[in-house]
Amino acid sequence: MSLKQHTQAIFRQQFSHEPNITIKAPGRVNLIGEHTDYNDGFVLPCAIDYETVISCSKRDDRQIHVIAADYDNQQDIFSLDEPIVPHAQYRWADYVRGVVKHLQLRHADFGGASLVISGNVPQGAGLSSSASLEVAVGQALQSLYQLPLSGVELALNGQEAENQFVGCNCGIMDQLISALGQQDHALLIDCRTLETRAVPMPENVAVVIINSNVKRGLVDSEYNTRRQQCETAARFFGVKALRDVDPNLFFSIQDELDPVVAKRARHVITENERTLTAADALAAGDLKLMGQLMHESHISMRDDFEITVPPIDSLVDIVKSVIGEQGGVRMTGGGFGGCIVALMPNSLVEQVRAAVAQQYPAYSGGRTETFYVCQASQGAGLC
């Protein structure tokens, strides 16, 4: 049974009628452009074929009824005519409530809805299960009530819900790629203007995500520290964000900066350059250049931004030893654990899977990896 069929079946069981519509919103992986989003820079993610699915229908009352199929059909009911506050018990419900509340703040005109939510985006792996949920809820209400909201507005609404209602700091990339992703394309996103450019993926290339299963322990405190260091560097150069610093200027006077701050700035400034070049390399089908840029990105994250850990570095080395110049591999996400992403010919996937299974536990204290083979997928919409 597909995720769509499963969600529809639970809807019928819970509400005793057919849903009006079923919609989906995907998770994502970032191919290159790490810690550039909050520096007003560039990122190059793609949506993946792991997604949140919602079967839904309108209600005659002004209530939102939500069933979480993946949490033993836990239920949340709240009114559109009363202040929407965080749920006393269910963390998942806050993502739904936050999206609904922020749609109201945008003066969107909608009534009650019955929703059944299910998904297969791995949680805690840095593949944006939360952004997928936020965009899916927004898309469900938009589709039910024909709300005049663009994909960018749905993404911004999800980001606001996560930042202000749920209380998690995040950039706009995750929601934007979930809302706007295109089949068989990555999306070059300008995080300042929110302009996007669809970048075709080469044929017969797999997007492989490997979870190190190293828990991302320091990520919140270290994220905040890195962000402050980037802001310090931007102030030194008298610009709004590091995106505005010319690389030649930076290299000519980087010695005047605090050494650690200089390293952080060097990563962001060079990563923006790499990301723009990578979009062109990918569009041209130049996997050799793409692989070189992904390698440079990983080295920069390891040595300048200092956000990798030894098991992650080992995992990258194992994959690189198999794919050589036929693709690329690097850590993806906030750092200190989590996942790596690799682009490779479909023909090498099983060879990589075998090499990682055989070699990785020796470098990871006996941990085993989780292996996902993905394709670049369509963003939110009817399914």
Swiss-Prot record:
- Record keywords, A-Z: ATP-binding, Carbohydrate metabolism, Cytoplasm, Galactose metabolism, Kinase, Magnesium, Metal-binding, Nucleotide-binding, Transferase
Coiled-coil intervals: none
Where can this protein be found? Cytoplasm
Q: Which domain of life is it from?
A: Bacteria
Alphabetized Pfam families for the sequence: GalKase_gal_bdg, GHMP_kinases_C, GHMP_kinases_N
MF GO annotations: ATP binding; galactokinase activity; magnesium ion binding
Record-linked InterPro entries: Galactokinase, Galactokinase_bac, Galactokinase_CS, GalKase_N, GHMP_kinase_C_dom, GHMP_kinase_C_sf, GHMP_kinase_N_dom, GHMP_knse_ATP-bd_CS
Q: Which residues bind Mg(2+)?
A: 130, 162
Is Oxidoreductase there in the keyword field? no
Show the active-site residues: 174 (proton acceptor)
Catalytically driven reaction(s):
alpha-D-galactose + ATP = alpha-D-galactose 1-phosphate + ADP + H(+)
The record lists ATP as bound by 124-130
**For substrate, which residues are the binding ones?**
34-37, 223
Q: Which GO terms describe its biological process?
A: galactose metabolic process
Which residue positions does UniProt flag as site: Transition state stabilizer? 28
The UniProt entry's GO CC annotations, sorted and at most eight, read: cytosol
State the EC number(s): 2.7.1.6
Pathway entry: Carbohydrate metabolism; galactose metabolism
Task: Extract the NCBIfam families matched here.
Answer: gal_kin, PRK05101.1
Which family is this protein grouped under? Belongs to the GHMP kinase family. GalK subfamily.
Describe the function of this protein.
Catalyzes the transfer of the gamma-phosphate of ATP to D-galactose to form alpha-D-galactose-1-phosphate (Gal-1-P).
Name this protein carries in UniProt = Galactokinase
**Organism listed in the record:** Yersinia enterocolitica serotype O:8 / biotype 1B (strain NCTC 13174 / 8081)
